Amino acid sequence: MLPASLKRYAWLSIAAALATILLKGWAWRLTGSVGLLSDALESFVNLAGAMMALAMLSLAALPADDNHAHGHGKAEYFSSAFEGFLILVAAVSIAYAAIERLFNPQPLEAVGIGLGVSVIASIINLVTSRILMGVGRKYKSITLEADAHHLLTDVWTSVGVIAGVGLVWVTGWLWLDPVIAILVAMNIVWTGWQLLQRSAAGLMDVSIPADELKAIEGILNNYRQQGLEFHALRTRQAGTRAFVSFHLMVPGAWTVQHGHDWSERIEAEIRRAVSHAHITTHLEPMEDPVSLADQDLDRQAD
């Protein structure tokens, strides 16, 4: 599935964010709970993140051009970094509102109705996050994965808030409402930090996942048994695309056509194992001492 096809899932996230903003905002207005307010604020972050995801998926879907020969797939990492940053901002906002309420406790109202509305909003987020996570992992879209993680964080936030507000309702301990909001803020900081780390890794040309790299190495090792050699295997992940390159060493007496035919055969097998891979093969003669020495990943001019 191309990034253009993934955009409909970003629209799903936007629709879910709008629905939960209305529901959680209503729950907060009914109860006056700072915990539910923190939950509602995070839904605004969800909306901003979903809109950013849509924009970056649209950019990532653009074809390669003269200035972007490898396409625009890395645009997705800007979206996930933006989501991570927004999560951290939401955590700070929640903590600020909670600390203020801690020193100025307020009684809660219409708690039963407010909690019921919040539960409905949480179910919407849970279903949406499961859909986005499945699609994101299947098609290697860090944008959709980031959005799914964000929504799942929101679900756990809501669970904590609902439980806490319920306890306040039962016990009358007003201080518990802001304390729960502070704990929620501390919890979601971790998710935001993880998203920022993954985004930075992608922008720094991180290698493809270990299981895919192992599959490629297994294929190349099988061809070694047929008399071929390989070195300088390089991989990198760029959004939904994986880029793979290696040097294929063949007998020097082979014709270019014969070497090319073997190269095509190997590349086709790699694509069957890693369907989203873009592969570049460099042919070298086995007998050439320069070829034997040419194994450094960062070869410099002599």
Give the ranges of each region predicted by the language model.
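Peripheral (non-transmembrane) domains and long loops of multi-pass membrane proteins
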Residues: 1-12, 67, 72-75, 187, ...
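Alpha-helical transmembrane cores and adjacent cytosolic helix/loop segments
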Residues: 1-211
